[in-house]
Amino acid sequence: MVYELKDTSKVKDLFTGSVDSLVTSCLQGMMDSKIYVTDLENPRSAMAFLACFAFFAGEPDRELASFKPKGVVGMVPCSEAWAKLIEECQPDADKVTRYAIKKGAKFDRANLQRLVDALPEGYEIQRIDGALYDKCMEIDDFEDAVCHFASKEQYLEMGRGFAAIKDGEPVSVASSYTVYREGIEIEIDTLESERRKGLAAAVCARLILSCLDDGLYPSWDAANMNSVHLAEKLGYEFSHEYPCYWLDALLDIVIQDPDKTNWPSFCGEYELPIKDHRIYEVSLKDGDLYLHFVNSEGKPMDLKFWPIGPDAFGLLWGDDRITFTPDALILDGDVVCKKLS
């Protein structure tokens, strides 16, 4: 059986060698972090869980590798043995590569200030206050930067962040994804239409300077090489690659043998009523429904719909939920895409 461990000191030695700040947050009992074990008295294995990541330590344990706390998305093994066990227990997980960044960076304040000052005309940087927090929570691209705190009040008390503002709206956000006593873990997100303008570098540099002013360390972990390059521009150094097993809660609710009688009626073209009025095309291929569109970077996308109800579907590796009506496709419950054909 899997138990939540309150006395985190019992597993501190198991996590010796871990450099991820989320593990540090868990061992310090910060935010809504959890430590899970299968032996409360003498744990030889442990899972540290915070935000949407689970980190394993100690002896490989099948119960822990099979356990999925609510909200978990990424499982990070500490050894090949743990990785093999996760693959056995989570066969639908998608293995991805993440990039660790060295701790203890020696930042050049002058360089950071130059990046802040290079903010393009028409933009300004604002610290995230209550109003900006609310806006971030309402925008899918920025929600993850602030949502892992228990409340807005907790974020404003414990966290920190800055946003590049254009026409009164946030377009790039650097924020504390999580916190630990000695610092924060940085999350950076920029709207697709606002990328390659130096906005991410500017808001990240401003956040790092804020941390340095208050004696906090701004920890960084990268999901892709673009993030690594940005980190290096800011003064960090790349450390190493590591595996992460990406789960999707959607798979737990997918209907395995759906009634496809009405699926042909869902096919056709739909117009997205916001942004660039993008056209979505829904079609059947090999008995499954697919969504076809061209993203904002001009790249064709072909995504499979996964049935979760008679007329409801989800997309893997995202929170999007789609419902069909006779004359529309409804995205996430409120964006109505009118059927054109």
Residue ranges and their predicted role:
Residues 151-191:
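A conserved beta-strand-loop-helix scaffold within acyl/acetyltransferase catalytic domains
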Residues 30-135, 245-246:
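Acyl-donor-binding surface of acyltransferase catalytic domains
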Residues 1-20, 107-152:
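Short amphipathic alpha-helix that is part of the acyltransferase structural core
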Residues 251-341:
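Peripheral terminal and inter-domain segments
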